[in-house]
Amino acid sequence: MEESDEPEQPISLGRQEYRRRRLPSQPMVDKSQQTEIGEKKKGMAAVQPPAPKATHSIGNIPGGKANYSGKEYESLILSSQLQQTWMKRKQGQEMTDKSFQTDTSVEEKVEVIFMDKALEENSASVGEIAPASPQGVSEVEIPTSRPPSLLIDRAQQTSCTGDWSLISICSKDKVDKEQQTYFSELETTVKSMPGSSLIKSKEETVPIAEDGSLVEIDGSLEIEVLSTEKIPDVVMSFTEGEISGELQAVPDDEATVKAEHFFTEETSIQAPSLAKETSAAETTAKTPKEFVDIQALPADELSSTEPPADIRPPLVKGTLSEEPSDQQYPKGTVVAPSELPVEDLVPLSEEVLEKVQALAIDTILDDSGRAESTTVEEATGEVQPPLSEEITKEVPAEVHLPIATHSKEIVIIIDKEFAIDEDFEDQPPFITEVAEDEATAEVQPPSAEDAPEEVAPSEVLPPPTEQGTVEHMTAEVLSPSTEVGPAEVPPLPTEEWPLPPVTEESPAEVTPPETEEGPIEPAEEGPEDGLLLPTEEIPSEVQPPSLEKVPLEEVVIPQAEEVPLDDLPIEVQPLPAENIAGWVPDEFQAFPVDEYPAREDTVEVQPSSLESAPIEESSVEAQLLAAEADTAEIEETPTEVAPAEDQLLPAEEVVLKVEVATAWSPLSELPPAEEATVEAQLTSVEESLKRTSVDVQPPPLDTLAEESPAVKQPLKTDVVPMPEFPGEEMTAQDPLPPSVKTTVDQDLLKEHQLPEIADISQVKLEYTTFTGDKKSKGTDSVPEDVTGIKDDQISTFKIEGTIKIELKNSTS
C-alpha cells in the first residue's frame, strides 16, 4: 500500500500540480513576468511532498509511473519553456517597439555621426564629380558644420520624431531649394542621407550625382551663395581666396551680383548701425543698396556699365568688406582677420576686375571708346586698392566709417549739385552715360573700396558737398559728429575732408583735390593723376590745378588736409595732448602752418566760393577761439586748421590773433566748458590726431608745403590772410619758443583744434543756428558770432584752459 500510496501521492500531486500549474500557466502566459512564480511553484511542489519528490524522482525511472512523471515533467518543462518563449516573444515585441524608438534614436544618432563622415565622403565624391572640386568641398564643409549641429540639437530634443521631421522637411526643402542654393541642397542632402542612413551608399551616390549635376548646371549660383555665406560665417582667408577664384569662374553678372549681395548684406548690417548713429548713416545705408542696384543694372548691361560694375563689386568687396569690417571692427573688433584677407581679396578682385574690365572694355569699345574711362578707372581702381589697403590698415575703421557715409551722401549730392555727367563728359563718354549711376557707384564704391583713395573721390564729393552741399555738410557734420561721438564729431565736420587725407596721409589729401577735379572738372586728369599721383606728386600737382580749376575743391582739399588733424584726432584720441604738444607741435606747427596757410588760402578761396563752408569754419573759429586755450595744447594740429580759419576770416584772424595775443593767456585759461569736456576728448583725440597727423600729415605737409607756394601764389591774390599766413609760418617755424608767436600759433592751433572741439559743441550749435544763416550770412556774420562766442567761451573756459595749456606749454 505504501508503494501504491507513494505512487498515487505523486500522481495525485503531479496532477494537482499539473492542474495548478496548468491553470496559472494561462495567466502566466498572459503575464510573462510570472515565470519566476512558476519556478517557485515548482519548488513549492517539490517541497510540499518531500517523499513523493523522491518517489517522483524514482518514478521517473519506472516505466508506468515514468509516463505520468515524464509527462508532468515535460509539462513542467514545456510550461516553463512556453513561459520563457512567451516572455521572450513579449520582450521581443517590446524590443521591436522600443527598437523603433530607442534603436532608431540610437541609429539616428549614429547616423548623425555618420552624417559628418558621409558629408566628408560626399564632399570628396562631389569634389570629384563636381566641375569645381574645391568649391564643392568647401560647400560641403559648410553644411557639415551646420546640419550636424541642427540634427544633433534636435536629436537631443526628440529621439525619433525630431530627426525624422527634419529629414522629411529637409527632403521638402531640398526639392524646393535645390535650384535656389547649392548650400541648402547640401544641408538637405546631408539631412536626408541620415534619414536613410542604412542606404547611405545609395543615397550618397544619388546626391553626389545630383550635386554634380547641380554644380554643373547652377555652379555659378551655388558658388555665389556659398561665397557669400562662407565669408560672413567663416571669414577665412582660404575661403576668400576661393571666393575670388569663384568670382573669376563665375560670369561677370554673377560676380557682380555676388559682390553686390554680399556687400549689400555687410553694408546693410553696417549701415543700420550707422543709421542708428546718424541719419546720414541711414542715407549711406540706403545709398549702398542703391549703388548695388545700380551696379546690378550695369552688371546686366555688361556692355557699358559692366566694367565699372565689375570693378565695383570686387573693389567693393575689398572696400566694403574692409569698411564694413572696419565699421564692424570699431563695434565688434573681432573681424579684423577677415579685413586683412579681404584686402588680399582686393588685389585678386582687382585681377578679376582687370580681366572683366578687359572684356567689358571690348564691349565698351563697341559702345563708345569707353574703354578709356574704364582704363582710367582701372588704373585708378588698381592703384587705389593697395592704397586703400594701406590706408585701411592705417586708419581703416574710423576713417572709413565717416568716409563711406559721407562719400555716399556726397555722391547723392554730387549727382544733384554737380553734373557728374558733365564732369565725366570730360572723361570718356562711358562715364558720361553711366556718370550718375556709376559715377555715384564708382565714386562711392571706390570711396568704400579705397575709402582713403577713392575716399579722395568721396572727398571730391565732400568738397562739392562743401560747395553745393555745405548744408549737407552741416547736417552731415552734425550727424557724423553724432556718429563718431564728441571726439570724432569735431573731425567729422572736417572728417569728410580729413578722413581721406588722413587715410592716404598726404597723397590722399591731395587725391581728393584731383578726384574732386577729376569727377568735377577734369574727370580724366582727376582719376588718373589724382589717384595715381596723389600718393606721390598729387599734393603739389593736384592742389595747384585744383586751385586753378576749382578753388572750392582745392579749398576742400586744404580743408580735408586740415581736417586730417581732425580725422587723426579720432585715431589719435588715446595719445595725451601733452605728449602731442611735446613732440607733435614742432612738426605740425612748422609743416601745417607752412602748408596749411596755402591750404587756408585755398580755404579762403572756398569761403569766397563757399561762404557756407567758411561760415562753418568761422563758427568753428569762434569755437576755436573759445577753445584756443585747449588748442594751445593741440597747437600742433590746430596750426593746420587755424591758418585755414584765419585765412577764411582774415578780419577774424586779425581779431582772433589780437585776441589770442591779448587774451591768449586768458584763452589758455578759457577752455570752454564744451571744450573742457571736448578737450579731454580732443586732447586724447587730438593727441592721437597729432601723432597720426605727425605720422600721416608731415609727408602731406611737406608735399603741401611745396604745394603751398603754388597754392599760395594763386590764392594770395584772393586770400587776404596770406600776410597772416606768413606770420603763421613764422609762428609755425617758431611755434613754441616765442610766446607771442606761440600764442598766435596756439591760437591758430586752438582754432584748428577748436574746430574739432568747438566744431563738436559749437559747430553743432552753429550748424543749427547757422545752417540757414551761414548760407545767407557768409563769413562776415560768423566772425561776429565768433567774437561773441570767443568772449563767452573765454569767460567760461578760463580755469580748465589754463591748466591744460600750462601742462602743454611745459611739455612743449
Curated annotation (Swiss-Prot):
Cellular localisation: Cell projection, Cilium, Flagellum
Alphabetically ordered keywords of this record: Calcium, Cell projection, Cilium, Flagellum, Phosphoprotein
Feature: compositional bias, Low complexity: 275-286, 502-513
InterPro entries: FSCB
Biased composition annotated in UniProt, kind: Pro residues: 488-501
Domain of life: Eukaryota
GO BP term, example: negative regulation of protein sumoylation
Region (Disordered): 1-66, 269-333, 367-388, 424-547, 672-741
Cellular compartments per GO CC: sperm fibrous sheath; sperm principal piece
Phosphoserine: residues carrying this PTM: S25, S57, S125, S133, S184, S273
Residue ranges, compositional bias (Acidic residues): 514-528
GO MF annotation terms: calcium ion binding
Sequence intervals crossing the membrane: none
Subunit details: Interacts with CABYR.
Functional summary from the UniProt entry: May be involved in the later stages of fibrous sheath biogenesis. Binds calcium.
Name the UniProt record assigns to this protein: Fibrous sheath CABYR-binding protein
Organism: Rattus norvegicus (Rat)
